[in-house]
């Protein structure tokens, strides 16, 4: 392989390809002599869109094929939505750059209602996320949440043909695909706390590939990296995955990190939440300590119950 080439592994969905082109454009801007070649791939997660993620092994199904391509030296980097990435990496790989984060919030979309609070009892809301389901049931107990899979276009089509009264999607994905006009309402974190890593693009690479590591470092956005490190540290301590409703959202306020998080039951009947602040050097410590607090206040029992199901 030429030293002036990077092979980029990506999923084939429109959003994944947008993210891949974003990274390609950035790398070629900072390194004018570099040529980035996209290697679109179909992952296991793309092949089982009819089944809820919580029942199929989680979002790691969307990254394993890409990781294998990097490990086998068929690709040099893999580009992911960080919220889809597992907490632990295969030996030899790592999350080496976090691009500047897009809006991490959730969006409410409906053809009939202008505000999520207007939903009447019995309204059907679509989402594939247990985190969103938990918070929707907590705040609006009269609604019915049903699973919603597929890429963004497929989900919008299901809304348009009347399968759902409303759906909830990530703001970042809609903005990246030029679909801001479909958003009815952006949900405040107090109503729908985002998932760890939501809205952020991550670059995975072989840790011994020093040349590529130096190149992709130019795309790393330090403030976004700090927030993501904080959010994912909490998830690691909780050992939380797609089968568990967990929100983990860090912001920078007054020159310090502010992490808010919750662990909940899927039906929204029980939610343990909390927050913690600290300096930038303590990003992972903040997440770890808040996780311990949540565990001591009842999250451990929720997680144990979910693991038995």
UniProtKB/Swiss-Prot annotation:
Its EC number is 2.5.1.61. Binds 1 dipyrromethane group covalently. GO terms for molecular function: hydroxymethylbilane synthase activity. Keywords: Porphyrin biosynthesis, Transferase. Pathway: Porphyrin-containing compound metabolism; protoporphyrin-IX biosynthesis; coproporphyrinogen-III from 5-aminolevulinate: step 2/4. It comes from the Bacteria. It holds the Pfam family Porphobil_deamC. One of its GO terms (cellular component) is cytoplasm. Its cofactor is dipyrromethane. It catalyses: 4 porphobilinogen + H2O = hydroxymethylbilane + 4 NH4(+). The modification S-(dipyrrolylmethanemethyl)cysteine is found at residue 242. Monomer. Belongs to the HMBS family. The porphobilinogen subunits are added to the dipyrromethane group. Tetrapolymerization of the monopyrrole PBG into the hydroxymethylbilane pre-uroporphyrinogen in several discrete steps. This is Porphobilinogen deaminase. It comes from Hamiltonella defensa subsp. Acyrthosiphon pisum (strain 5AT). The gene is hemC.
């Amino acid at each position: 392989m030429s030293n002036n080439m990077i092979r980029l592994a990506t999923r084939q969905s429109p959003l994944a390809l947008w993210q891949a082109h974003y990274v390609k454009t950035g790398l070629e801007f900072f390194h004018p002599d570099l040529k980035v070649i996209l290697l679109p791939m179909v992952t296991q997660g793309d092949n089982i869109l009819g089944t809820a993620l919580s029942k199929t092994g989680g979002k790691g199904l969307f990254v394993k094929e890409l990781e294998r391509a990097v490990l086998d030296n068929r690709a040099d980097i893999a580009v992911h939505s960080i919220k889809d990435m597992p907490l632990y990496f295969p030996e030899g790989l790592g999350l080496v750059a976090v691009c500047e984060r897009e809006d991490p919030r959730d969006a409410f979309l409906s053809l009939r209602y202008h505000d999520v609070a207007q939903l009447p009892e019995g309204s059907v809301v679509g989402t594939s996320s247990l985190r969103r389901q938990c918070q929707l049931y907590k705040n609006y107990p009269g609604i019915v949440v049903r699973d919603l899979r597929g890429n963004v276009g497929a989900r919008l089509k299901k809304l348009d043909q009347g399968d759902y009264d409303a759906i909830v999607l990530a703001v970042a994905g809609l903005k990246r695909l030029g679909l801001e006009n479909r958003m009815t309402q952006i949900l405040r974190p107090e109503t729908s706390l985002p998932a760890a890593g939501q809205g952020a693009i991550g670059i995975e690479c072989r840790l011994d590939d020093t040349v590529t590591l130096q190149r992709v470092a130019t795309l790393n956005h330090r403030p976004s990296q700090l927030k993501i490190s904080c959010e994912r540290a909490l998830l690691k301590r909780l050992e939380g995955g797609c089968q568990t409703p967990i929100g983990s959202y860090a912001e920078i306020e007054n020159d310090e990190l502010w992490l808010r998080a919750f662990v909940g039951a899927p039906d929204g009947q029980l939610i343990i939440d909390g927050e913690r602040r600290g300096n930038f050097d303590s990003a992972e410590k903040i997440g770890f300590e808040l996780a311990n607090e949540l565990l001591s206040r009842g999250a451990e029992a929720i997680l144990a119950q979910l693991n038995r199901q």
